[in-house]
C-alpha cells in the first residue's frame, strides 16, 4: 500500500499486478528471488523489492508536496523503528499461535511501547513532523 501511495503521489506510471501470495507467479521470483511484494521493475531493468526503497525512489523522481524534503534523518529513523521493530511485534501479535514463546499480551505490550512513541510525536500536531504530511506518515500508516 505505501509503495503504491508514493508512486501515485509522484505521478509515476507503472503496471500494477495483484499477486496471490499463496500462488506466486514465476515472474515474481525471476524479478526478486525473495518472492515478496512489492516489486518494482524499472525501465532500466533494475529491480526494487522493498516498499520503503520504492517510496524513496518515487520521491526522488517527483516529490510535489515535499514529503521527504525535511527531517530526512528523523524520518528514516522513525520508519526504521516501524519496519524493524513494530512490524516484527505486530506480526507476532497477529499470528501469536506461531510464536508460543510468550503470551499474546506480551506481544501486544511490545506493540504498545512503539505506538506510545508515535502517539507522543502526534500529541500536539497532525503529522509526525508538523502540520504537513511526510514520507514517515505514509510509511507508518498502513500498519496502524
Task: Identify what each model region corresponds to.
Residues 130-144:
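GST superfamily/GST-like fold recognition
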Residues 81, 117, 142-144:
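Alpha-helical scaffold segments in carbohydrate-active enzymes
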Residues 120-131:
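Surface-exposed helix-capping loop/turn segments at secondary-structure junctions
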Residues 1-112, 119:
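GST-like domain detector, emphasizing the conserved glutathione-binding G-site
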Residues 37, 124-125, 141:
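Alpha-helix C-caps/helix-loop-beta hinges
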